[in-house]
């Protein structure tokens, strides 16, 4: 039993009270962006709200985004994992979870993230964001043929004047340099 934590309890209570206003501000494109301290308070307040309402999928997804913005891998991964467990068909939850896993320093997380991205590509091979994340993950995992295939699919989907095309074409060229002569045919 510990005493003297009044200040920490007060900070927690303030964060919980401020969370709705901070969230509104974070979602308003015209409002000032939240600084890191405000984002931390938002995360604390959101975690408290989600303890009261653990089935709030959108809340878990938003907490995952806040965790990513803070660079807090455990908050992001845990929040997205919870959202994904609640609704595996929710594309925002699945893609957020895959992104958090692929950014992890744990090779097993990277593998799981790659598997989830492969599932997402099979489900919707016209989602540019999914294809992009899949391609970069495949490249990082040295699966260069898969990366090239995903980037080529993106080129088919993007308009001719899209500025991303040049980056994708350079990425394809870089991946092709890593392929063996038999693979690049």
Listing of model-derived features with the role each one plays in the protein:
Residues 26-35, 39, 57, 61-124:
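Alpha-helical adaptor scaffolds
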Residues 1-44:
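Long, contiguous interaction/recruitment modules in multidomain scaffold/adaptor proteins
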Residues 139, 144-162, 170-173:
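TPR/TPR-like (Sel1-like) alpha-helical repeat modules
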Residues 49, 66, 100-103, 137, ...:
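Residue-level signature for tetratricopeptide repeat
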Residues 44-47, 81, 118, 152:
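Alpha-solenoid helical repeat scaffolds
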Residues 52, 86, 123-124, 157, ...:
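Structural marker of alpha-solenoid helical repeat scaffolds
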Residues 104-111, 173-185:
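Alpha-helical linker/edge segments of TPR/alpha-solenoid repeat scaffolds
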């Amino acid at each position: 039993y510990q005493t003297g934590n009044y200040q920490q309890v007060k900070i927690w209570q303030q964060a919980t009270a401020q969370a709705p206003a901070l969230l509104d501000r974070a979602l308003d494109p015209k409002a000032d962006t939240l600084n890191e301290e405000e984002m931390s308070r938002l995360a604390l307040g959101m975690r408290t709200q989600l303890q009261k309402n653990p089935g709030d999928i959108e809340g878990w997804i938003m907490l995952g985004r806040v965790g990513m913005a803070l660079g807090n891998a455990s908050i992001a991964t845990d929040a997205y994992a919870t959202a994904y467990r609640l609704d595996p068909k929710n594309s925002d939850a699945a893609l957020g979870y895959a992104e958090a896993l692929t950014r992890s320093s744990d090779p097993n997380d990277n593998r799981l993230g790659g598997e989830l991205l492969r599932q997402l590509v099979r489900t919707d091979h016209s989602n540019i964001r999914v294809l992009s994340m899949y391609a970069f993950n495949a490249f990082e995992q040295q699966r260069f043929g898969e990366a090239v295939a995903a980037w080529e699919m993106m080129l088919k989907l993007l308009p001719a004047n899209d500025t991303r095309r040049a980056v994708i074409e350079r990425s394809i060229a870089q991946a092709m340099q890593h392929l063996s002569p038999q693979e690049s045919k």
